[in-house]
Every structure is written in C-alpha cells, then in structure tokens.
C-alpha cells in the first residue's frame, strides 16, 4: 500500500486550447517600410479539473504595430492536463507556477512562431522565460489574481 502515498506527477495531455490571428490593416500595412514595434505579454493559469488533475495554461499575446496601426495580433493559449497527487501542499504553487509552465511553454513558442510565419510575416521567436522569477514576482506582489507579465 506504500505506492498509494508516493508522489505522482504525470502529463496526461498537451493541447492548443485557443489561437487567433488578426491582420486588421492588411494589405495596406504590408507595404509600409517602417520597422514595426513588438509587444509580447505572457500569463500562466492553473485550474483544478478533477481529483488530482490540473489544467495549466500559458497564454501569449503578440502584437506588432507601425505607428498606431496594428500589423498583426496573435493570441494563443497552450495548455496541458497534469496528474499531481501526494505532493505536499506547500510545493503545489511552485509546481503549478514554474514546473508545469516550463513543460507547456515550448509548445506555445512553436505554435506562435508557426502561425506568424504562415501569415506571411517573418517569424517572431518568443525567448526563454524564467518562470521561477515570474512566480516569485507574482508571490511578492501579493495574494491575488495572477497578473500577466510583460516581456520585451
């Protein structure tokens, strides 16, 4: 019966939960010669979905603008279902806010780069993210909803 008390951490499934691409000013903006400005925002969400099962999602919003006109806007949410059992409660925040997002994020990066490339733009490669630092920053900001962290 000792196996029932052993910690369990397994990925059940990784999936693309949401993806949208908008090019509201095409085709005219495609003829612009000016260099666009890039804004990237990331967020992490964790939700229980059953006894010992959790969905962890990493979201990205990538927007490029020339002056005040949007060149393109990509919103993506990559998620995974994790089975997590028999883990001390004081470790769950770190697992949900650091370990799980580190597993999900590479899938998100690939999907975002792919959709931007397929839309006819040079790929935007999302950089590596320090989820530990992001988690610690959120913890320091207080007990509340996890605010998206902006990276550039």
Swiss-Prot record:
<protein>
    <recommendedName>
        <fullName>Protein-export protein SecB</fullName>
    </recommendedName>
</protein>
<dbReference type="GO" id="GO:0005737">
    <property type="term" value="C:cytoplasm"/>
</dbReference>
<dbReference type="GO" id="GO:0006457">
    <property type="term" value="P:protein folding"/>
</dbReference>
<comment type="function">
    <text>One of the proteins required for the normal export of preproteins out of the cell cytoplasm. It is a molecular chaperone that binds to a subset of precursor proteins, maintaining them in a translocation-competent state. It also specifically binds to its receptor SecA.</text>
</comment>
<dbReference type="Pfam" id="PF02556">
    <property type="entry name" value="SecB"/>
</dbReference>
<keyword id="KW-0653">Protein transport</keyword>
<dbReference type="GO" id="GO:0051262">
    <property type="term" value="P:protein tetramerization"/>
</dbReference>
<comment type="similarity">
    <text>Belongs to the SecB family.</text>
</comment>
<comment type="subunit">
    <text>Homotetramer, a dimer of dimers. One homotetramer interacts with 1 SecA dimer.</text>
</comment>
<keyword id="KW-0963">Cytoplasm</keyword>
<dbReference type="GO" id="GO:0051082">
    <property type="term" value="F:unfolded protein binding"/>
</dbReference>
<dbReference type="GO" id="GO:0015031">
    <property type="term" value="P:protein transport"/>
</dbReference>
<keyword id="KW-0813">Transport</keyword>
<keyword id="KW-0811">Translocation</keyword>
<keyword id="KW-0143">Chaperone</keyword>
<dbReference type="InterPro" id="IPR035958">
    <property type="entry name" value="SecB-like_sf"/>
</dbReference>
<dbReference type="InterPro" id="IPR003708">
    <property type="entry name" value="SecB"/>
</dbReference>
């Amino acid at each position: 019966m000792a196996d029932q008390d052993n910690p369990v951490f397994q990925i059940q499934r990784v999936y693309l939960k949401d993806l949208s691409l908008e090019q509201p000013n095409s085709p005219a903006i495609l003829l612009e010669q000016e260099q666009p400005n890039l804004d990237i925002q990331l967020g992490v969400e964790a939700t229980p979905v059953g006894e010992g099962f959790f969905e962890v999602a990493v979201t990205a919003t990538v927007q490029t603008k020339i002056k005040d006109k949007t060149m393109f806007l990509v919103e993506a949410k990559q998620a995974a279902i994790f089975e997590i059992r028999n883990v001390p409660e004081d470790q769950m925040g770190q697992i949900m806010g650091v370990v799980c997002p580190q597993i999900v994020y590479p899938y998100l990066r690939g999907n975002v780069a792919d959709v931007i490339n397929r839309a006819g733009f040079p790929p935007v490669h999302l950089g590596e993210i320090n989820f530990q630092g992001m988690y610690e920053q959120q913890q320091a900001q207080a007990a509340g909803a996890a605010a998206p962290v902006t990276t550039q």
